[in-house]
């Protein structure tokens, strides 16, 4: 049948499926009335929809059109506090034929899918928006675009619900209708969809036959020709429902919440762990105050694992204005928290999507034929600042403007977003909206807005947040979102048991940068803005490194396939299996229960030692001890991504960067912690014969050592140096040097690799370290990094430096000789059998230390296994909320590993701490996995652009770990022409202030990427 005659207007009650909501026996439903389902009243006079300004149809500008169309009204301006909600404009998208476009519809979904492959390579597919399902017709108006025959009887025809798929290519600005292989889902509307990698997961909804089954349908878009799959899920699940929400949390958990099961609105929470097979739904009972039973809300997940549920309509058909955050504790508990800030309006049947830390909310209905309009039709919840903004200002009280029944006129930009039952998705900094319903008229327009604040979370925003939340009611989180885990605070206060003590960063941030790094993981998407060229250069350089190692990785994988390498039962994140279906490699959450690590012995000292960066003046050489909780930037790793054009990296020059080089002569010439100056002449002071002698002596020592060194405390641990010999000398000067006049007689030295490349003085660095190894072979220890490989350091500066400073013939010979020595370097070090030190990480393949011990040396990267690749190349995931294995943004085939892998490894090997290097971190050190892993980086201002601090770890006999830091030096006052080390353009992101800002007080909120002991949600 075409209509459900039982559905009649009933004041403000939405009985869209009366036989379902009313508890009567279900029967097929085929339409909804706008008064009931959509709460719409008649369209504007004449039945027309305001015509948006035309866009440039020129295909040549299609890639920039979406950003340009919003840029006209959003000129750069001085921002004091959070930016207001952006303005939307119409995109004039192209299509080859009419049916390629989705046409008018509502109740559909729009899902952003990241790019596949590398741009410029065969098979590359750019970022896309995938539109599925929805209702395409209204009762009394089959076309859905004109004036209905009667405003009161115009309803949504569920007989017109579809299961078609349309794809919008963001780069080409073009719609295409897809015809995937496989069995599609049944036609439906009011369903949910979310992306899992390059797959779109569909669930629930309602169609011509009533409620859709609870099956999970997956549209795999990895290949050129998409394919539908049905996911087999065991046990009971959410059951059939519509008007619910679903999101992927922490890149792992599919969360389904609320909706209507045909009888009543719901408030239940279901989770499906995509890493655990067989798949099964688990009903959660989160702690804290959660949302009431409701439907037509929105849910969007932030990249760090926070799910935000916003708005909706409760069991009494009352629209909601509240927002709730849901996050997972490290012990497996889930908890709700009410989001701070004042929402500008209640709403339901709206759309919401995160762009970094900002939740963009658009449109929505209020009931009684009213829709959200005026400046509140578009709103932003800035989760970094803890405030709501509409298109005009920060919201301090609910808006009380008019909510007329579809009144025409007014601001055209506001009119564009005055709609409900539409869908939204984000690609980079761009927010797209498609379709929906306004005044009984189905819409078919594609809107776009640019979030100019995507990379901004300013100091002023933090102050605005604090001011806005001064009078927050009980149960709300004041100021910035932050959920403090009291158990970890107690742990910090009871450190006498010897546990690893974790603190929260609070110290003067480098560069005065107060913003929380909440960049999304999927850096592959275009439009992601970075605040400086330096970070872009580091991203490009890291991608080039991955490109350089790709052949080696492919060879290692080939050996694995041929049976030469046996891997444990794990896979590589979302890599494709032979069947073409992406798999997941995260560990079951209940396995964490068996991963307990006895917190005895090792602990992180509650204070770190910091040296002022100034070389003179009142602060010159001043040493301070700061609380370990005072490092604002500890959670900020220099992000990696895949830039649009990653080419072979060139040598980076920085007049601050240096490195070392044979025994007593080398030590006498180079070990000058306070007096070393970069040589005026670049000619290296050793000849190739002397370097050969040094390498021969050191190589004999390395060959006699085990692959995993067995060391004792006390010991100093150094991270990446990358040819920055000046930083090595500064660390020796401030915290003791390896000489008889220094502290070598009572403390050992351990270096974690990456001695060469990037900096100007790789020869000095490696020469001095080798000389120290020969002179103090039982006290100075070196292990291998990923740059101690010929195929890498041929591209990133070391080979060029050898030729430049020793001539082509001798330079190439020396480069080959030192790389042969690198093949003998040990690969890890165990300290007191409680700490394991390595360069990269444990990746996907390393479960036991014995796997590392069994690697035979000498070994080249080309001949190495996946174990060697993981050991030298893998990284931790973005933060503690991202568990299991994920693809590594450094490049294809490389992985990141989550805190569950760290805990499992420590438990398997009776270890308490992993110390690794490999990644630039802003404070020189960074904690992960509740403090069971520390990333260490000793070179400051990495690549001349990162402006990061450098650090070492000092482990005492009492097994207390003390971080000791140095900050980047300010640029030299001498001119580039007269300076021995020529000034290079864009060396610094910005100059450091002559006087650093005052140290913030203890106890300030942690940033959202905290790797310490508390759970910072927002």
Swiss-Prot record:
Residue ranges, compositional bias (Pro residues): 41-57
Residues the entry annotates as binding Mn(2+) 2: 754, 786, 839, 918
Domain of life according to the entry: Eukaryota
PANTHER family named in the record: SERINE/THREONINE-PROTEIN PHOSPHATASE BSL3 (PTHR46422), SERINE_THREONINE-PROTEIN PHOSPHATASE BSL2-RELATED (PTHR46422:SF7)
Family: Belongs to the PPP phosphatase family. BSU subfamily.
UniProt-listed GO biological process terms: brassinosteroid mediated signaling pathway
Polar residues compositional bias, start-end: 994-1011
Cofactor binding note of this UniProt entry: Binds 2 manganese ions per subunit.
Name of the protein described by the UniProt record: Serine/threonine-protein phosphatase BSL2
One cellular component term from this protein's GO annotations in UniProt: plasma membrane
Keyword terms, alphabetized: Cell membrane, Cytoplasm, Hydrolase, Kelch repeat, Manganese, Membrane, Metal-binding, Nucleus, Phosphoprotein, Protein phosphatase, Repeat
Record lineage: Eukaryota, Viridiplantae, Streptophyta, Embryophyta, Tracheophyta
Active-site annotation: 787 (proton donor)
Biased composition (Low complexity): 63-75
EC number: 3.1.3.16
Tissue expression as described in the entry: Expressed throughout the plant, with a higher level in younger parts.
Claim: Phosphoprotein is one of the keywords in the record: yes
Top class in the EC scheme: hydrolase
Main subcellular location: cytoplasm
Complexes and interactors: Interacts with BSK8.
GO MF terms held by the record: metal ion binding; protein serine/threonine phosphatase activity
Pfam family, one: Kelch_2
Positions of post-translational Phosphoserine modification: 627, 975
Catalysed conversion reaction: O-phospho-L-seryl-[protein] + H2O = L-seryl-[protein] + phosphate; O-phospho-L-threonyl-[protein] + H2O = L-threonyl-[protein] + phosphate
Kelch repeat copies, ranges: 149-195, 253-301, 306-356, 362-409, 430-479
Cofactor: Mn(2+)
